[in-house]
Amino acid sequence: MSQHVETKLAQIGNRSDEVTGTVSAPIYLSTAYRHRGIGESTGFDYVRTKNPTRQLVEDAIANLENGARGLAFSSGMAAIQTIMALFKSGDELIVSSDLYGGTYRLFENEWKKYGLTFHYDDFSDEDCLRSKITPNTKAVFVETPTNPLMQEADIEHIARITKEHGLLLIVDNTFYTPVLQRPLELGADIVIHSATKYLGGHNDLLAGLVVVKDERLGEEMFQHQNAIGAVLPPFDSWLLMRGMKTLSLRMRQHQANAQELAAFLEEQEEISDVLYPGKGGMLSFRLQKEEWVNPFLKALKTICFAESLGGVESFITYPATQTHMDIPEEIRIANGVCNRLLRFSVGIEHAEDLKEDLKQALCQVKEGAVSFE
């Protein structure tokens, strides 16, 4: 029976133990599992390879994304690192130009050393994308919407091109989650989540998830996961399951607030522009003057100046010195991540309270009431 995403989320782990009938999934902390004899495994041998609690999370995300197999990692970057093990020296990937700084750092500072080449594209021009495809191209890696400029890519359109050329299509779905977007249904082969963000939702765990479209690729990814070993621990797996149960409710409030806050910010004369695709809980905006950035951040009382996103609390991040600091300044600014840009992870607080906080901070900055030091 096909179920709605809200039901899938609420039911995660609820029938995991038929012996006791426990509703809340157990946390299996054991690192090893007893065998009755040679070749008589229970299916669980060693915690790095497989763990019952982690298995529930992996099955849940595969079910939510309608994929063949899910895999849980110790962080979003560990998930991407393990995906990169699919490639070898000489391979080329085409990647979103407006990319999370941590992913850019991994590609440019780590994987280039092993002979991989990365070409950057905003995926707005089909001819431009096609021109970057060479005989060595193996995959296209897309963030949609991008971090932090909130640019959406047409996954279906890109998928038609990747299939035409026999390329893998990898999509980072962190910002939209399976509630708002399911890339495998649109033609992607691999989906990534930094589950630290919306899926966990409470700023209290570090996790990454991957879902693959077919079992063959899933088995290959599992072998890399087992070999590299950056797996999600049992307790963090349980925390993630607990957070995911309320994902749909939280995303609804994140989105409602973000829509209201985006409209509010567009009316403020201290703001030059607002970047919001119309859905989801993430937006970015630029202040009129660079020198206003630090005083504005200092003046906030409810909204937290912090480097993360997707939690129930509202966060504002300064990409230039936080998430994107490892991208060379000339490249960062050319891509649109200027020194006036702020990224806003809109929480689930009352929208009027968030407006009041923004309003008083902007007012203080404009009137010079906050120290510029």
Curated annotation (Swiss-Prot):
Disruption phenotype: Cells lacking this gene are unable to grow in the presence of sulfate or cysteine as sole sulfur source, whereas their growth in the presence of homocysteine, cystathionine or methionine is similar to that of the wild-type strain. It holds the Pfam family Cys_Met_Meta_PP. Its cofactor is pyridoxal 5'-phosphate. CDD domains: CGS_like. It comes from the Bacteria. The modification N6-(pyridoxal phosphate)lysine is found at K197. It is found in: Cytoplasm. InterPro entries: Cys/Met-Metab_PyrdxlP-dep_enz, Cys_met_metab_PP, PyrdxlP-dep_Trfase, PyrdxlP-dep_Trfase_major, PyrdxlP-dep_Trfase_small. It is an enzyme of class 2 (transferase). Keywords: Amino-acid biosynthesis, Cytoplasm, Methionine biosynthesis, Pyridoxal phosphate, Transferase. Disulfide bonds: none annotated. Induction: Up-regulated at the transcriptional level when sulfate, cysteine, cystathionine or homocysteine are the sulfur sources. Repressed by methionine. Catalyzes the formation of L-cystathionine from O-acetyl-L-homoserine and L-cysteine. Cannot use O-succinyl-L-homoserine as substrate. Also exhibits O-acetylhomoserine thiolyase activity, catalyzing the synthesis of L-homocysteine from O-acetyl-L-homoserine and sulfide. This is Cystathionine gamma-synthase/O-acetylhomoserine (thiol)-lyase. It comes from Bacillus subtilis (strain 168).
